[in-house]
From Swiss-Prot:
Residues 87-112 have a biased composition (Polar residues). Residues 113-139, 217-244 have a biased composition (Low complexity). Residues 141-157 have a biased composition (Acidic residues). The lineage of its organism: Eukaryota, Amoebozoa, Evosea, Eumycetozoa, Dictyostelia. It comes from the Eukaryota. This is Uncharacterized protein DDB_G0288739.
Amino acid sequence: MDTPNNRGINIRFVTNKKVLWPEDVAAKLFSQYQTMLATKLYTKDMEIVEILSGTTPFKGVYTLEQIKSKIKNQKHSLSMKNLALQKTSQQIDSSPPQTPTTSNGSMMTRRQNANNAISSNNNTNTNVTNGSSSNTSLNGGDEEQEEEEEEENDEDSITNKEDSDSYDDFSIVEETTDIREVQDTRSFKKVKLNSLTSLNEGYIVPPTPQIEMVSPNRNNNNNNINKNNNNNINNNNNNNNNIFNFLQDQDQNQNKPNKPNNQSNFSNQSQQLQNLINATANENKKLKLSMEQLEFQLKMEKEQNLKLKNLVTKLNEEIQLEKEISKQINKSICSNLNIQNSRSISTNSVIFKKDSNDDSIVAIFPTFITTTNSNSSEITLTIDPNPPENYHKIIIKQQLHQHHQHQQQQQQQQPQIQTYLIKKLQDYYDPEPCLIGSTNSKGVYFKSKDKSLLKISIDNLRDFD
């Protein structure tokens, strides 16, 4: 954005509220002005700070708060400087005027001596007439000369009073003691002295007054001059009348033939303006139609997005429902089989324990849990501590309960021992899986990490001796 006085510099603050000031631009800008003025403009994505002027350049990276503090400090320092200047000016105005003096005496005394020297030297004027020089003085004007000297002395006293107020800043003035250096100035002009001018330089010496000799041809010359002046005046009047008549005729000539042209030009301009208005109206109609189409498309897209959002919500609900159903199925299976999970073993070593019912030894790994079904035959899961690569040897031994009435039958039946080789699935196990074992289905079921039932099918079946 350009400022009306074209003194500004645009500084954009991005989202991190920092900006790098160009050294040349900032130094050039802030060295030219003595006031600081900042206006902030906020937009949707960023903040723009427009610095119009300043006293010192800002260089480097500054945050918005740092720039605000600098602006505040500079305004405060400027106000303090203005206050000090006001106090100084008040003190200067209230102090009485003083005439500076030197070791040789006051300035007023020196100026009076110079004036007296000038007035005493008035008798030695040099008169120049028609290129000839004369060293004689005017003998007939002694009384007039005395009156003029008195008037000049009065004027000098008044001028000295006036000049005494303007010599406050004068420090030291060179003193002139040689009277010959001061020229005769019967009607001289005084100027104000400053701290760099001397007493001799304080006066402007006018040219020497000339005395005109009366000649017999003076009257004739005056008559000729008057005639020439009258002729010049008459010629000027005639020229003025001619110019006035020419301008009047030109105005009349311009007004008469140009009326129809002006009307035709006006009609053409009005027709062009009407055409432009019509074209603008057509463009506005097209823009309006395009805007309506865009609004309709946006509306349709919003409806489609809403439908997709509802569909995603429904799918998520169905997935959550399936998970809940899976959990319920797992719970029902474990409860129907009456399987009780034993505690997990948090050791990496293999634990061997002896079964109390028989002499079989069961090896238990931390990732597996032995289960017992009291209503049916006991199922014991045994894992080979040295399985082949990528395989576990799982031994499932089924042993029927011993009953006294069926001792003879039980003696005939030998425990059925089956050995299965399955792939390692420790990546799928839960820390405490629910193990379901069955020899009839020739498979082992585990509860995987995603809370679903995982059936491990039997790859190979062989006898174990």
